[in-house]
Amino acid sequence: MAVNNRVKITNDIELKDRLVAINRVTKVTKGGRTFSFSAIVVVGNEDGIIGWGLGKAGEVTAAIAKGVEAAKKNLTRVPVLKGTVPHEQSAKFGGAEVFIKPASTGTGVVAGGAMRAVLESVGVTDVLAKSKGSSNPHNLVKATILALGEMRDARMVAQNRGVSMEKVFRG
């Protein structure tokens, strides 16, 4: 069941941005080579809100700024319980497949590269994560946010089913 987890940006949300990857692109023309840059940026308030954006420009700083602006327009709310995720979840985007699993307090963020940036930006402090397939940062970021967006805590499940929280746990 698709649940709308979209968040509208307001001034009271303080977002921190993290650069996931930067790529230099070369365009060969008759007059020589023209360089441009693309940047994948993740923004989050470290309290359950996450967004990602891709910025492209002739300068690195301009590409990052465009990525941040794009990320602010693409925010999603994620349930974070006691510094970890509520349950196991896997997702696939393109050739990248990710698996996210809750961890006990003190474990830390056990994840690599692009997944680590996303999980830290959303405010998860203890989690086990594994990626399979492609290590392309674009697809890893999208797959990780897709997996996080599919997370449901007990309150959300009870609300969707129209039953009490006790009935969710007792069956």
UniProtKB/Swiss-Prot annotation:
Start and end residues of each S5 DRBM domain: 15-78
Subunit structure: Part of the 30S ribosomal subunit. Contacts proteins S4 and S8.
Family membership: Belongs to the universal ribosomal protein uS5 family.
Reported function: With S4 and S12 plays an important role in translational accuracy. Located at the back of the 30S subunit body where it stabilizes the conformation of the head with respect to the body.
UniProt cross-references to InterPro entries, sorted A to Z: Ribosomal_Su5_D2-typ_SF (IPR020568), Ribosomal_uS5 (IPR000851), Ribosomal_uS5_bac-type (IPR005712), Ribosomal_uS5_C (IPR005324), Ribosomal_uS5_N (IPR013810), Ribosomal_uS5_N_CS (IPR018192), Ribsml_uS5_D2-typ_fold_subgr (IPR014721)
Listed name of the protein: Small ribosomal subunit protein uS5
Natural source organism: Phocaeicola vulgatus (strain ATCC 8482 / DSM 1447 / JCM 5826 / CCUG 4940 / NBRC 14291 / NCTC 11154) (Bacteroides vulgatus)
Single GO biological process annotation from the record: translation
Keywords: Ribonucleoprotein, Ribosomal protein, RNA-binding, rRNA-binding
Keyword tRNA processing on entry: no
GO terms of molecular function: rRNA binding; structural constituent of ribosome
Origin superkingdom: Bacteria
Pfam assignment, any one: Ribosomal_S5
Domain notes: The N-terminal domain interacts with the head of the 30S subunit; the C-terminal domain interacts with the body and contacts protein S4. The interaction surface between S4 and S5 is involved in control of translational fidelity.
Gene Ontology CC: one annotated term: small ribosomal subunit
Gene coding for it: rpsE
